[in-house]
């Protein structure tokens, strides 16, 4: 998750996209992926720019963009942000579009050998936009 500040001015969003594959942290003197899954899979990505999709209805503060840039080792001008409020059609599509990703993550968490999965598909209903993000 991406967060900054407290109280009424607090910012919080879930993020997805290429930035998650680029983001690293230093732990015990070693650089490693922020995402545990990428660490387990031994996957690393490198780029001069990145993109992130945020499930949120307001523009993130500069501090959040700087945090993403630092973790991804890119200049802040190379961070491309797409905002998809959950209450919008784009937000609903973004959530529904991850149905296969969630299934594969579940298979991984159950220690099913992912190399045995050759192909996959998923379907889910697309909810209509709703002004209340909880109901959306």
From Swiss-Prot:
- What InterPro entries does its record include? METHMP_CycHdrlase
Catalysed transformations (reactions): 5,10-methenyl-5,6,7,8-tetrahydromethanopterin + H2O = N(5)-formyl-5,6,7,8-tetrahydromethanopterin + H(+)
- Return the Gene3D superfamilies for the record: Methenyltetrahydromethanopterin Cyclohydrolase, Chain A, domain 1, Methenyltetrahydromethanopterin Cyclohydrolase, Chain A, domain 2
The annotated pathway is: One-carbon metabolism; formaldehyde degradation; formate from formaldehyde (H(4)MPT route): step 3/5
Entry's EC annotation: 3.5.4.27
Pfam entry (one): MCH
Q: Which GO terms describe its molecular function?
A: methenyltetrahydromethanopterin cyclohydrolase activity
Q: Can you supply a Gene Ontology BP term from the record?
A: formaldehyde catabolic process
What sort of enzyme, by top EC class, is this?
Answer: hydrolase
Keywords attached to this entry: Cytoplasm, Hydrolase, One-carbon metabolism
Hydrolase as a keyword of this entry, yes or no, is yes
Q: Which GO terms describe its cellular component?
A: cytoplasm
Q: What broad class describes the main subcellular location of this protein?
A: cytoplasm
Subcellular location field: Cytoplasm
Per its database record, what is this protein's job?
A: Catalyzes the hydrolysis of methenyl-H(4)MPT(+) to 5-formyl-H(4)MPT.
Please report which protein family the annotation says this sequence is part of: Belongs to the MCH family.
Protein name in the entry: Methenyltetrahydromethanopterin cyclohydrolase
- The organism encoding this protein is Methylococcus thermophilus
């Amino acid at each position: 998750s991406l967060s900054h500040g407290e109280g009424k001015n607090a910012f919080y969003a879930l993020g997805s996209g290429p930035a998650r594959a680029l983001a690293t942290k230093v732990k015990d003197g070693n650089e490693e992926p922020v995402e545990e899954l990428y660490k387990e899979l031994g996957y690393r990505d490198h780029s001069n720019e990145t993109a992130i999709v945020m499930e949120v209805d307001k523009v993130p503060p500069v501090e959040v963009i700087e945090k993403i840039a630092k973790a991804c080792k890119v200049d802040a001008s190379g961070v491309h942000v797409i905002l998809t409020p959950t209450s919008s059609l784009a937000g609903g599509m973004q959530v529904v579009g991850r149905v296969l990703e969630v299934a594969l993550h579940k298979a991984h968490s159950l220690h099913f050998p992912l190399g045995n999965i050759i192909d996959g598909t998923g379907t889910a209903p697309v909810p209509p936009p709703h002004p209340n993000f909880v109901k959306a």
